[in-house]
Amino acid sequence: MSAVTSDTITFECETGNYHTFCPISCVAWLYQKIEDSFFLVIGTKTCGYFLQNALGVMIFAEPRYAMAELEEGDISAQLNDYKELTRLCNQIKKDRNPSVIVWIGTCTTEIIKMDLEGMAPKIELEINTPIVVARANGLDYAFTQGEDTVLAAMVERCPAKISLDSNSNKESKNPESEQAPLVLFGSLPSTVASQLNLELKRQGINVSGWLPAQRYTDLPILEKGTYVCGINPFLSRTATILMRRRKCKLIGAPFPIGPDGTRAWIEKICSVFNIQPQNLDERENQVWQSLEDYLQLVRGKSVFFMGDNLLEISLARFLIKCGMIVYEIGIPYMDKRYQAAELALLEKHCNDMNVPMPRIVEKPDNYNQIQRIKELQPDLAITGMAHANPLEARGISTKWSVEFTFAQIHGFTNARDILELVTRPLRRNNSLEGLGWNSLVKENIK
Protein backbone atom coordinates (compact mmCIF):
# COMPACT_ATOMS: atom_id res chain seq x y z
CA MET A 1 0.00 0.00 0.00
CA SER A 2 1.25 3.48 -0.82
CA ALA A 3 0.10 6.64 0.95
CA VAL A 4 0.38 10.27 -0.12
CA THR A 5 -0.60 13.04 2.27
CA SER A 6 -1.84 16.35 0.86
CA ASP A 7 -2.31 18.88 3.69
CA THR A 8 -4.73 17.03 5.98
CA ILE A 9 -6.16 14.70 3.32
CA THR A 10 -4.51 11.30 3.16
CA PHE A 11 -4.63 9.38 -0.12
CA GLU A 12 -3.80 5.69 -0.11
CA CYS A 13 -3.60 3.14 -2.91
CA GLU A 14 -3.88 -0.58 -2.24
CA THR A 15 -4.11 -3.34 -4.85
CA GLY A 16 -4.41 -1.50 -8.15
CA ASN A 17 -7.43 -3.67 -9.05
CA TYR A 18 -10.95 -2.51 -9.87
CA HIS A 19 -13.73 -4.12 -7.83
CA THR A 20 -16.70 -2.48 -9.51
CA PHE A 21 -19.83 -2.96 -11.58
CA CYS A 22 -19.00 -3.41 -15.29
CA PRO A 23 -18.63 -0.10 -17.21
CA ILE A 24 -20.67 -1.36 -20.19
CA SER A 25 -23.71 -0.77 -17.95
CA CYS A 26 -23.50 2.90 -19.02
CA VAL A 27 -25.63 1.76 -21.95
CA ALA A 28 -28.56 1.52 -19.51
CA TRP A 29 -28.91 5.27 -19.04
CA LEU A 30 -27.20 6.61 -22.18
CA TYR A 31 -29.53 4.93 -24.68
CA GLN A 32 -32.46 6.49 -22.83
CA LYS A 33 -30.80 9.91 -22.68
CA ILE A 34 -29.79 10.10 -26.37
CA GLU A 35 -33.15 9.37 -27.95
CA ASP A 36 -32.00 8.95 -31.57
CA SER A 37 -29.05 6.66 -30.77
CA PHE A 38 -28.39 2.93 -31.00
CA PHE A 39 -25.74 1.21 -28.85
CA LEU A 40 -23.99 -1.90 -30.14
CA VAL A 41 -22.02 -3.74 -27.44
CA ILE A 42 -19.30 -5.91 -29.02
CA GLY A 43 -18.45 -8.71 -26.60
CA THR A 44 -19.03 -12.28 -25.48
CA LYS A 45 -21.99 -14.15 -24.02
CA THR A 46 -20.91 -13.00 -20.57
CA CYS A 47 -21.48 -9.36 -21.59
CA GLY A 48 -24.89 -10.29 -22.98
CA TYR A 49 -25.91 -12.09 -19.78
CA PHE A 50 -24.74 -9.11 -17.73
CA LEU A 51 -26.77 -6.64 -19.79
CA GLN A 52 -29.87 -8.83 -19.64
CA ASN A 53 -29.65 -9.27 -15.88
CA ALA A 54 -28.36 -5.85 -14.85
CA LEU A 55 -30.72 -3.89 -17.07
CA GLY A 56 -33.75 -6.13 -16.50
CA VAL A 57 -35.00 -5.85 -20.08
CA MET A 58 -38.24 -7.53 -21.12
CA ILE A 59 -38.11 -9.84 -24.14
CA PHE A 60 -40.52 -7.76 -26.21
CA ALA A 61 -39.30 -4.32 -25.09
CA GLU A 62 -36.96 -3.88 -28.10
CA PRO A 63 -34.59 -1.38 -26.48
CA ARG A 64 -32.24 0.71 -28.60
CA TYR A 65 -29.17 -1.40 -27.90
CA ALA A 66 -27.96 -4.86 -28.89
CA MET A 67 -25.12 -7.34 -28.47
CA ALA A 68 -22.71 -8.21 -31.26
CA GLU A 69 -21.66 -11.56 -29.84
CA LEU A 70 -18.11 -12.66 -30.55
CA GLU A 71 -17.70 -16.35 -31.40
CA GLU A 72 -14.72 -18.68 -31.66
CA GLY A 73 -14.26 -17.75 -35.29
CA ASP A 74 -13.91 -14.08 -34.39
CA ILE A 75 -11.35 -14.74 -31.69
CA SER A 76 -9.25 -17.08 -33.86
CA ALA A 77 -9.45 -14.59 -36.77
CA GLN A 78 -11.28 -17.07 -39.04
CA LEU A 79 -14.18 -14.66 -39.59
CA ASN A 80 -14.02 -11.21 -41.13
CA ASP A 81 -14.90 -8.68 -38.42
CA TYR A 82 -15.37 -5.89 -40.95
CA LYS A 83 -18.00 -7.78 -42.95
CA GLU A 84 -19.89 -8.89 -39.84
CA LEU A 85 -20.00 -5.40 -38.33
CA THR A 86 -21.04 -3.90 -41.67
CA ARG A 87 -23.90 -6.40 -41.90
CA LEU A 88 -25.04 -5.64 -38.35
CA CYS A 89 -24.87 -1.86 -38.84
CA ASN A 90 -26.84 -2.11 -42.08
CA GLN A 91 -29.46 -4.16 -40.26
CA ILE A 92 -29.61 -1.60 -37.41
CA LYS A 93 -30.03 1.23 -39.91
CA LYS A 94 -32.78 -0.62 -41.74
CA ASP A 95 -34.69 -1.56 -38.57
CA ARG A 96 -34.18 1.55 -36.39
CA ASN A 97 -32.64 4.28 -38.58
CA PRO A 98 -30.76 5.96 -35.69
CA SER A 99 -28.91 9.28 -36.02
CA VAL A 100 -25.81 7.65 -34.50
CA ILE A 101 -24.57 4.14 -33.75
CA VAL A 102 -22.30 3.84 -30.71
CA TRP A 103 -19.95 0.85 -30.60
CA ILE A 104 -19.09 -0.19 -27.05
CA GLY A 105 -15.83 -2.11 -26.84
CA THR A 106 -15.46 -4.70 -24.06
CA CYS A 107 -12.67 -6.67 -22.39
CA THR A 108 -12.63 -9.24 -25.20
CA THR A 109 -12.25 -6.68 -28.01
CA GLU A 110 -9.36 -5.22 -26.03
CA ILE A 111 -7.65 -8.57 -25.52
CA ILE A 112 -7.92 -9.73 -29.16
CA LYS A 113 -6.97 -6.22 -30.37
CA MET A 114 -9.98 -5.58 -32.58
CA ASP A 115 -9.34 -2.40 -34.56
CA LEU A 116 -12.73 -0.79 -33.91
CA GLU A 117 -11.42 2.74 -34.50
CA GLY A 118 -10.01 1.65 -37.86
CA MET A 119 -13.17 -0.08 -39.08
CA ALA A 120 -15.71 2.49 -37.88
CA PRO A 121 -14.89 5.33 -40.37
CA LYS A 122 -15.05 2.94 -43.35
CA ILE A 123 -18.38 1.42 -42.30
CA GLU A 124 -19.68 4.92 -41.49
CA LEU A 125 -19.03 5.94 -45.11
CA GLU A 126 -20.74 2.80 -46.40
CA ILE A 127 -23.95 3.15 -44.39
CA ASN A 128 -23.95 6.97 -44.21
CA THR A 129 -24.62 6.99 -40.45
CA PRO A 130 -22.17 8.31 -37.82
CA ILE A 131 -20.43 5.62 -35.76
CA VAL A 132 -18.87 6.58 -32.42
CA VAL A 133 -16.40 4.14 -30.84
CA ALA A 134 -16.06 3.98 -27.05
CA ARG A 135 -13.88 1.47 -25.20
CA ALA A 136 -15.82 0.80 -22.00
CA ASN A 137 -13.94 -2.33 -20.98
CA GLY A 138 -13.62 -3.39 -17.36
CA LEU A 139 -9.85 -3.90 -17.67
CA ASP A 140 -9.11 -0.18 -17.91
CA TYR A 141 -12.22 1.50 -16.55
CA ALA A 142 -14.41 1.43 -13.45
CA PHE A 143 -18.23 1.35 -13.35
CA THR A 144 -19.32 4.88 -14.32
CA GLN A 145 -16.25 5.58 -16.44
CA GLY A 146 -18.12 3.85 -19.25
CA GLU A 147 -20.11 7.07 -19.67
CA ASP A 148 -16.87 9.04 -19.55
CA THR A 149 -15.43 7.15 -22.54
CA VAL A 150 -18.65 7.61 -24.56
CA LEU A 151 -18.82 11.36 -23.90
CA ALA A 152 -15.10 11.78 -24.60
CA ALA A 153 -15.65 10.11 -27.99
CA MET A 154 -18.67 12.34 -28.69
CA VAL A 155 -16.66 15.51 -28.03
CA GLU A 156 -15.01 15.00 -31.42
CA ARG A 157 -18.44 15.01 -33.09
CA CYS A 158 -19.59 18.32 -31.59
CA PRO A 159 -19.79 21.13 -34.20
CA ALA A 160 -17.15 23.85 -33.98
CA LYS A 161 -19.18 26.67 -35.52
CA ILE A 162 -22.80 27.57 -36.09
CA SER A 163 -24.17 28.48 -39.51
CA LEU A 164 -24.64 32.18 -40.28
CA ASP A 165 -28.43 31.90 -40.69
CA SER A 166 -29.03 30.13 -37.38
CA ASN A 167 -26.56 32.46 -35.65
CA SER A 168 -28.41 35.58 -36.80
CA ASN A 169 -31.72 34.06 -35.72
CA LYS A 170 -30.27 33.19 -32.33
CA GLU A 171 -28.93 36.72 -31.81
CA SER A 172 -32.25 38.27 -32.68
CA LYS A 173 -34.05 35.99 -30.22
CA ASN A 174 -31.49 36.17 -27.39
CA PRO A 175 -30.48 39.66 -26.27
CA GLU A 176 -28.09 38.16 -23.70
CA SER A 177 -25.89 36.65 -26.42
CA GLU A 178 -22.91 38.65 -25.12
CA GLN A 179 -22.44 36.03 -22.38
CA ALA A 180 -19.69 33.56 -23.17
CA PRO A 181 -21.18 30.16 -24.06
CA LEU A 182 -21.52 27.62 -21.23
CA VAL A 183 -21.83 23.89 -21.94
CA LEU A 184 -22.57 21.39 -19.16
CA PHE A 185 -21.38 17.81 -19.60
CA GLY A 186 -22.75 14.67 -17.98
CA SER A 187 -25.82 12.53 -18.54
CA LEU A 188 -28.86 13.44 -16.44
CA PRO A 189 -32.59 12.77 -16.81
CA SER A 190 -34.29 15.62 -18.67
CA THR A 191 -36.19 16.78 -15.58
CA VAL A 192 -33.00 17.12 -13.51
CA ALA A 193 -31.16 18.87 -16.35
CA SER A 194 -34.06 21.33 -16.61
CA GLN A 195 -33.86 22.00 -12.85
CA LEU A 196 -30.15 22.86 -13.10
CA ASN A 197 -30.79 25.04 -16.16
CA LEU A 198 -33.47 26.89 -14.19
CA GLU A 199 -31.21 27.39 -11.15
CA LEU A 200 -28.56 28.99 -13.37
CA LYS A 201 -31.15 31.05 -15.25
CA ARG A 202 -32.27 32.54 -11.92
CA GLN A 203 -28.73 33.88 -11.61
CA GLY A 204 -28.83 35.31 -15.14
CA ILE A 205 -26.75 32.54 -16.73
CA ASN A 206 -27.95 30.76 -19.86
CA VAL A 207 -26.76 27.23 -20.64
CA SER A 208 -25.78 26.95 -24.31
CA GLY A 209 -26.06 23.17 -24.42
CA TRP A 210 -25.53 19.79 -22.81
CA LEU A 211 -23.20 16.93 -23.65
CA PRO A 212 -24.84 14.52 -24.28
CA ALA A 213 -27.84 16.28 -25.79
CA GLN A 214 -31.32 14.77 -25.86
CA ARG A 215 -30.72 14.07 -29.54
CA TYR A 216 -27.40 13.39 -31.25
CA THR A 217 -28.27 15.96 -33.91
CA ASP A 218 -28.44 18.64 -31.16
CA LEU A 219 -24.88 18.24 -29.84
CA PRO A 220 -23.58 21.56 -28.44
CA ILE A 221 -21.26 23.90 -30.33
CA LEU A 222 -17.73 23.82 -28.91
CA GLU A 223 -15.61 26.76 -29.98
CA LYS A 224 -12.27 27.88 -28.57
CA GLY A 225 -12.91 29.59 -25.24
CA THR A 226 -16.28 27.93 -24.56
CA TYR A 227 -16.79 27.43 -20.83
CA VAL A 228 -17.53 23.84 -19.80
CA CYS A 229 -18.53 22.47 -16.40
CA GLY A 230 -19.05 18.87 -15.29
CA ILE A 231 -21.93 17.63 -13.19
CA ASN A 232 -20.41 14.25 -12.25
CA PRO A 233 -17.06 13.39 -10.62
CA PHE A 234 -16.28 10.51 -13.00
CA LEU A 235 -15.95 12.59 -16.19
CA SER A 236 -12.26 13.51 -15.97
CA ARG A 237 -11.38 12.05 -19.38
CA THR A 238 -14.15 14.08 -21.04
CA ALA A 239 -12.92 17.22 -19.25
CA THR A 240 -9.37 16.59 -20.48
CA ILE A 241 -10.49 16.07 -24.10
CA LEU A 242 -12.61 19.24 -23.97
CA MET A 243 -9.62 21.28 -22.81
CA ARG A 244 -6.90 19.73 -24.99
CA ARG A 245 -8.70 19.03 -28.25
CA ARG A 246 -11.39 21.73 -28.30
CA LYS A 247 -9.53 24.40 -26.26
CA CYS A 248 -12.49 24.86 -23.89
CA LYS A 249 -12.16 26.46 -20.45
CA LEU A 250 -13.03 24.08 -17.62
CA ILE A 251 -14.84 25.51 -14.59
CA GLY A 252 -13.45 23.54 -11.64
CA ALA A 253 -16.37 23.39 -9.21
CA PRO A 254 -17.76 20.96 -6.64
CA PHE A 255 -20.47 18.80 -8.14
CA PRO A 256 -24.19 19.63 -7.74
CA ILE A 257 -24.93 16.74 -5.38
CA GLY A 258 -26.70 17.78 -2.18
CA PRO A 259 -27.75 21.36 -1.34
CA ASP A 260 -24.20 22.30 -0.24
CA GLY A 261 -22.63 21.00 -3.46
CA THR A 262 -25.32 22.56 -5.65
CA ARG A 263 -24.85 25.95 -4.02
CA ALA A 264 -21.04 25.77 -4.38
CA TRP A 265 -21.43 24.68 -8.02
CA ILE A 266 -23.69 27.65 -8.83
CA GLU A 267 -21.44 30.07 -6.92
CA LYS A 268 -18.36 28.93 -8.85
CA ILE A 269 -20.08 29.34 -12.22
CA CYS A 270 -21.36 32.79 -11.17
CA SER A 271 -17.85 33.85 -10.15
CA VAL A 272 -16.49 32.91 -13.58
CA PHE A 273 -19.13 35.09 -15.26
CA ASN A 274 -18.62 37.94 -12.73
CA ILE A 275 -22.16 37.61 -11.41
CA GLN A 276 -23.10 38.10 -7.76
CA PRO A 277 -25.27 35.08 -6.81
CA GLN A 278 -28.71 35.93 -5.48
CA ASN A 279 -30.74 34.23 -2.71
CA LEU A 280 -28.58 31.10 -2.54
CA ASP A 281 -28.41 31.27 1.27
CA GLU A 282 -32.19 31.19 1.56
CA ARG A 283 -32.47 28.49 -1.11
CA GLU A 284 -30.00 26.19 0.63
CA ASN A 285 -31.46 26.80 4.10
CA GLN A 286 -34.96 25.96 2.86
CA VAL A 287 -33.70 22.61 1.57
CA TRP A 288 -31.89 21.79 4.82
CA GLN A 289 -35.04 22.59 6.79
CA SER A 290 -37.10 20.31 4.56
CA LEU A 291 -34.60 17.48 5.24
CA GLU A 292 -34.76 17.76 9.04
CA ASP A 293 -36.81 14.55 9.49
CA TYR A 294 -34.05 12.60 7.71
CA LEU A 295 -31.21 14.48 9.41
CA GLN A 296 -32.47 13.37 12.82
CA LEU A 297 -31.94 9.76 11.72
CA VAL A 298 -28.38 10.19 10.41
CA ARG A 299 -26.77 12.63 12.87
CA GLY A 300 -23.95 10.94 14.74
CA LYS A 301 -24.17 7.77 12.63
CA SER A 302 -21.08 6.38 10.91
CA VAL A 303 -20.68 5.28 7.30
CA PHE A 304 -18.02 3.36 5.35
CA PHE A 305 -17.71 3.63 1.55
CA MET A 306 -16.22 0.51 -0.04
CA GLY A 307 -16.02 2.14 -3.48
CA ASP A 308 -17.80 1.38 -6.74
CA ASN A 309 -19.24 4.26 -8.77
CA LEU A 310 -16.79 7.19 -8.28
CA LEU A 311 -19.54 9.26 -6.61
CA GLU A 312 -18.04 8.45 -3.21
CA ILE A 313 -16.26 11.77 -2.51
CA SER A 314 -19.36 13.84 -3.31
CA LEU A 315 -21.70 11.60 -1.32
CA ALA A 316 -19.31 11.52 1.66
CA ARG A 317 -19.03 15.32 1.60
CA PHE A 318 -22.81 15.66 1.67
CA LEU A 319 -23.27 13.07 4.44
CA ILE A 320 -20.61 14.77 6.59
CA LYS A 321 -22.57 18.01 6.21
CA CYS A 322 -25.66 16.06 7.34
CA GLY A 323 -23.88 15.18 10.58
CA MET A 324 -22.55 11.71 9.77
CA ILE A 325 -19.04 10.43 10.46
CA VAL A 326 -17.27 8.91 7.44
CA TYR A 327 -14.60 6.39 8.40
CA GLU A 328 -13.25 5.62 4.96
CA ILE A 329 -13.89 6.59 1.35
CA GLY A 330 -12.93 3.76 -0.96
CA ILE A 331 -12.90 4.83 -4.61
CA PRO A 332 -11.82 2.84 -7.69
CA TYR A 333 -10.12 5.81 -9.39
CA MET A 334 -9.79 9.51 -8.67
CA ASP A 335 -8.43 12.38 -10.74
CA LYS A 336 -7.26 14.75 -8.00
CA ARG A 337 -7.09 17.74 -10.35
CA TYR A 338 -10.63 17.28 -11.67
CA GLN A 339 -11.99 16.73 -8.14
CA ALA A 340 -9.83 19.42 -6.47
CA ALA A 341 -12.80 21.69 -5.66
CA GLU A 342 -14.77 18.72 -4.30
CA LEU A 343 -11.88 17.68 -2.06
CA ALA A 344 -11.49 21.25 -0.77
CA LEU A 345 -15.20 21.36 0.13
CA LEU A 346 -14.91 17.96 1.83
CA GLU A 347 -12.05 19.26 3.98
CA LYS A 348 -13.98 22.45 4.79
CA HIS A 349 -17.03 20.45 5.92
CA CYS A 350 -14.87 18.23 8.15
CA ASN A 351 -13.41 21.32 9.84
CA ASP A 352 -16.82 23.03 10.15
CA MET A 353 -18.49 19.93 11.59
CA ASN A 354 -15.46 19.16 13.80
CA VAL A 355 -15.11 15.58 12.55
CA PRO A 356 -11.91 13.78 11.50
CA MET A 357 -10.97 13.66 7.84
CA PRO A 358 -11.86 10.25 6.37
CA ARG A 359 -9.22 8.05 4.78
CA ILE A 360 -9.40 8.12 1.00
CA VAL A 361 -8.33 4.76 -0.41
CA GLU A 362 -7.93 4.45 -4.16
CA LYS A 363 -8.35 0.97 -5.70
CA PRO A 364 -9.05 -0.56 -2.28
CA ASP A 365 -8.36 -4.19 -1.46
CA ASN A 366 -11.72 -5.67 -0.51
CA TYR A 367 -10.22 -8.20 1.90
CA ASN A 368 -8.47 -5.45 3.86
CA GLN A 369 -11.65 -3.37 3.81
CA ILE A 370 -13.68 -6.20 5.32
CA GLN A 371 -11.17 -6.39 8.18
CA ARG A 372 -11.39 -2.63 8.75
CA ILE A 373 -15.20 -2.77 8.70
CA LYS A 374 -15.09 -5.59 11.25
CA GLU A 375 -12.95 -3.41 13.55
CA LEU A 376 -14.81 -0.12 13.04
CA GLN A 377 -18.38 -1.53 13.07
CA PRO A 378 -19.94 1.37 11.09
CA ASP A 379 -23.68 1.97 11.23
CA LEU A 380 -23.82 1.73 7.43
CA ALA A 381 -21.60 0.41 4.63
CA ILE A 382 -22.21 1.68 1.10
CA THR A 383 -20.92 -1.14 -1.06
CA GLY A 384 -21.11 -3.01 -4.33
CA MET A 385 -23.72 -5.74 -4.60
CA ALA A 386 -21.20 -8.56 -4.19
CA HIS A 387 -20.43 -7.63 -0.59
CA ALA A 388 -23.87 -6.56 0.61
CA ASN A 389 -25.22 -9.93 1.77
CA PRO A 390 -21.98 -11.14 3.42
CA LEU A 391 -21.79 -7.87 5.38
CA GLU A 392 -25.47 -8.06 6.36
CA ALA A 393 -24.80 -11.60 7.64
CA ARG A 394 -22.14 -10.12 9.90
CA GLY A 395 -24.49 -7.53 11.32
CA ILE A 396 -23.41 -4.55 9.16
CA SER A 397 -26.24 -2.59 7.53
CA THR A 398 -25.55 -1.99 3.84
CA LYS A 399 -26.75 0.03 0.88
CA TRP A 400 -25.93 -0.78 -2.74
CA SER A 401 -23.78 1.92 -4.32
CA VAL A 402 -25.35 1.18 -7.72
CA GLU A 403 -28.64 2.63 -6.44
CA PHE A 404 -27.05 6.07 -6.14
CA THR A 405 -25.94 5.83 -9.77
CA PHE A 406 -29.46 5.25 -11.08
CA ALA A 407 -31.25 7.57 -8.63
CA GLN A 408 -31.83 11.28 -9.26
CA ILE A 409 -29.37 12.87 -6.82
CA HIS A 410 -28.40 16.18 -8.46
CA GLY A 411 -29.64 19.64 -7.59
CA PHE A 412 -31.38 21.18 -4.58
CA THR A 413 -34.65 19.29 -4.87
CA ASN A 414 -33.16 15.78 -5.15
CA ALA A 415 -31.16 15.84 -1.89
CA ARG A 416 -34.14 14.13 -0.27
CA ASP A 417 -33.68 11.13 -2.59
CA ILE A 418 -30.09 10.66 -1.39
CA LEU A 419 -31.16 10.60 2.25
CA GLU A 420 -34.11 8.35 1.42
CA LEU A 421 -31.62 5.75 0.15
CA VAL A 422 -29.14 6.24 3.00
CA THR A 423 -31.74 6.04 5.77
CA ARG A 424 -33.68 3.06 4.42
CA PRO A 425 -31.52 0.42 6.18
CA LEU A 426 -31.39 2.61 9.32
CA ARG A 427 -35.19 2.91 9.35
CA ARG A 428 -35.47 -0.83 8.79
CA ASN A 429 -33.29 -1.44 11.85
CA ASN A 430 -35.45 0.89 13.93
CA SER A 431 -38.57 -0.99 12.80
CA LEU A 432 -36.99 -4.34 13.73
CA GLU A 433 -36.08 -3.04 17.17
CA GLY A 434 -39.70 -1.95 17.60
CA LEU A 435 -40.70 -5.57 16.96
CA GLY A 436 -38.18 -6.81 19.49
CA TRP A 437 -35.72 -8.13 16.88
CA ASN A 438 -32.04 -7.33 17.14
CA SER A 439 -31.04 -8.39 13.63
CA LEU A 440 -32.23 -10.08 10.45
CA VAL A 441 -29.76 -12.97 10.67
CA LYS A 442 -28.56 -15.54 13.17
CA GLU A 443 -25.75 -14.50 15.45
CA ASN A 444 -22.27 -16.05 15.74
CA ILE A 445 -21.63 -16.20 12.00
CA LYS A 446 -17.88 -16.17 11.43
UniProtKB/Swiss-Prot annotation:
Q: Which Pfam families match?
A: Oxidored_nitro
Q: Which GO terms describe its molecular function?
A: 4 iron, 4 sulfur cluster binding; ATP binding; metal ion binding; oxidoreductase activity, acting on iron-sulfur proteins as donors; oxidoreductase activity, acting on the CH-CH group of donors, iron-sulfur protein as acceptor
Q: Which Gene3D superfamilies match?
A: Nitrogenase molybdenum iron protein domain (3.40.50.1980)
Q: For this protein, what reaction is catalysed?
A: chlorophyllide a + oxidized 2[4Fe-4S]-[ferredoxin] + 2 ADP + 2 phosphate = protochlorophyllide a + reduced 2[4Fe-4S]-[ferredoxin] + 2 ATP + 2 H2O
Q: What does the record note about the cofactor?
A: Binds 1 [4Fe-4S] cluster per heterodimer. The cluster is bound at the heterodimer interface by residues from both subunits.
UniProt-annotated binding residues for [4Fe-4S] cluster: C22, C47, C107
**Keyword ATP-binding attached:** yes
CC terms in the record's Gene Ontology section = chloroplast
**Which cell locations does it reside in?**
Plastid, Chloroplast
EC?
Answer: 1.3.7.7
User: Where is it mostly found?
Assistant: plastid
Q: Which keywords has UniProt assigned to this entry?
A: 4Fe-4S, ATP-binding, Chlorophyll biosynthesis, Chloroplast, Iron, Iron-sulfur, Metal-binding, Nucleotide-binding, Oxidoreductase, Photosynthesis, Plastid
Which cofactor names does the annotation list?
[4Fe-4S] cluster
Gene Ontology terms: biological process: light-independent chlorophyll biosynthetic process; photosynthesis, dark reaction
Involved pathway(s): Porphyrin-containing compound metabolism; chlorophyll biosynthesis (light-independent)
- Summary of subunit composition and partner proteins: Protochlorophyllide reductase is composed of three subunits; ChlL, ChlN and ChlB. Forms a heterotetramer of two ChlB and two ChlN subunits.
Q: NCBIfam families recorded for this chain? A: DPOR_bchN, PRK02842.1
Family designation: Belongs to the BchN/ChlN family.
Q: What does this protein do?
A: Component of the dark-operative protochlorophyllide reductase (DPOR) that uses Mg-ATP and reduced ferredoxin to reduce ring D of protochlorophyllide (Pchlide) to form chlorophyllide a (Chlide). This reaction is light-independent. The NB-protein (ChlN-ChlB) is the catalytic component of the complex.
Task: State the name under which the record lists this protein.
Answer: Light-independent protochlorophyllide reductase subunit N
Organism source for this protein? Mesostigma viride
Protein encoded by which gene: chlN
